[in-house]
Regions:
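Alpha-to-beta junction loops
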Residues: 85-88, 174-183
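Extracytoplasmic/periplasmic substrate-recognition and gating elements
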Residues: 38, 62, 193-221
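Glycine-centered hinge/linker elements that transmit conformational signals in sensory
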Residues: 78-80, 124-160, 206
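Extracytoplasmic "Venus flytrap"/periplasmic binding protein-like
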Residues: 1-24, 58-69, 170-172, 179-180, ...
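Hinge/lid segment of periplasmic solute-binding proteins
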Residues: 2-52, 102
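Short, solvent-exposed loop/beta-turn-alpha elements that line the ligand-binding surface or hinge
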Residues: 8-23, 112-137, 193-194, 208-218
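Short helix-initiation/N-cap motifs at beta->coil->alpha
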Residues: 71-75, 156-170
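Extracytoplasmic/periplasmic solute-binding protein
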Residues: 32-47, 51, 75-128
């Protein structure tokens, strides 16, 4: 205790004036000091929303696809795309020594859509092991996409070897190598030069299950 220096009211006001939902960011950065008094200790300079699916509006329109509003609809759309001869997903887990982290994001998003936040917290704090049936259920769901050769650009063997920075390129080829790419809000930095937001690409929320009463969770970092 006592290791953090409070930032003071001027910085707090700056956050309130300039950050969307400023009070929520202040709340996340406020902790009790050694005397039990609440202190504002930090500002967020970068955050990413991870529960996003990127796609080409033209590809959707040309094929008659609509943005899904539930996970059930997303999986039905995935199957429809494959039946139409299109590849639904581009997935790339490659990241040098950090290879695999995009799968973690998939797993976290799925856990938040299949179980309560309390279960998710138990998992990420290691109170619940990775071989817990609830975690295995999420792995099986991810595997139903990533291990299906008809669902992934390059087939399942390409998932681990495709670099995450290159994975979304399939959205922009002609013909498209994939229809959708689940990745965080930072990924447009790796899109091909010259593509335009809202024209060449757009995104939708990685949806929740309509059949589960778990709200609309959003994963961030």
């Amino acid at each position: 205790m006592g290791g953090l220096v409070p930032l003071g009211d001027d910085i707090k006001q700056m956050v309130l004036d300039n950050y969307a939902a400023g009070q929520s960011w202040i709340d996340l950065s406020t902790y009790d000091d050694e005397n039990g008094n609440e202190q504002f200790n930090a500002i967020f300079f970068r955050t990413n929303v991870k529960s996003l699916v990127w796609y080409s509006p033209d590809n959707f329109e040309d094929n008659g696809y609509e943005v899904p509003s539930s996970m059930e609809e997303l999986m039905a759309l995935t199957e429809q795309m494959a039946s139409d001869g299109n590849t639904p997903w581009c997935i790339g887990l490659g990241s040098g020594a950090a290879t695999g982290w995009p799968a973690t994001d998939w797993m976290e998003d799925i856990m938040l859509r299949t179980h309560s936040p309390d279960v998710y917290d138990m998992w990420v704090s290691n109170e619940m092991p990775f071989n817990d049936p609830r975690v295995l259920e999420a792995m099986d769901f991810f595997g139903s996409i990533a291990l299906n050769d008809s669902y992934v650009n390059g087939g399942s063997k390409a998932v681990a070897t495709t670099d995450f920075r290159d994975a979304p390129n399939g959205l922009f080829t002609s013909p498209a190598e994939c229809m959708m790419h689940r990745q965080a809000s930072f990924i447009p930095a790796f899109f091909p030069e010259g593509v335009e937001a809202g024209v060449d690409y757009d995104f939708f929320y990685f949806p929740a299950f309509a059949g589960k009463d778990l709200g609309t969770p959003v994963l961030g970092a």
